[in-house]
Amino acid sequence: MIGKLRGLIDSYAEDFVIIDVGGVGYQVHCSARTLQALPSPGEAATLSIETYVREDQIKLFGFRSDVEREWFRLLQTVQGVGAKVALAVLGTLPPADLGNAIALRDKAAVARTPGVGPKVAERIVTELKDKAPAFANVDPGVVRLSGAIEESRAPQPVADAISALINLGYGQPQAAAAIAAASRAAGDKAETAQLIRLGLKELAK
């Protein structure tokens, strides 16, 4: 089984890249986000690989990190999610944002993925809520905020600050992560305006 490829970028197609490794061209399917991050043809690249072996074909899927590959595997444990949908999700949400979206039960963020409807998005956040934290780099502050929001225990300035960032166009996972960091920096008595200001600084990093 192939676990990693290191070689020169030969060419690109809509959903895959050809990597030249010692004169052999490997066709590797990647998410749109990964394809955009890879270098120009002729330059070197390294991808973590998931190998699928079927009776009639061998298919390679490539990822920029082992964490992204683990997400690819985990997503496919959800009913109705195959390799194509898993790649589409990872093309829409990077691993950290996907982890935060699941921690926040933010099915709307997942549903922004082309081809993923509300029902599949809900299954993803529901079925993975207990599995994802085992390896995902989920902000502990987001997890705490998730529980507090669900139980209506979040301080009002925190809830208002998250709402304000969402109204500015940020997704709920990004807004919650930024305000979680702002809350840690400012302390429990921080007011809404201060949290928004610090949250925007976090998002600008």
Curated annotation (Swiss-Prot):
InterPro entries: DNA_helicase_Holl-junc_RuvA_I, Hlx-hairpin-Hlx_DNA-bd_motif, NA-bd_OB-fold, RuvA, RuvA_2-like, RuvA_C, RuvA_C_sf. It comes from the Bacteria. It comes from Bradyrhizobium sp. (strain ORS 278). This is Holliday junction branch migration complex subunit RuvA. One of its GO terms (biological process) is DNA repair. Residues 144-154 are annotated as: Flexible linker. Keywords: Cytoplasm, DNA damage, DNA recombination, DNA repair, DNA-binding. It is found in: Cytoplasm.
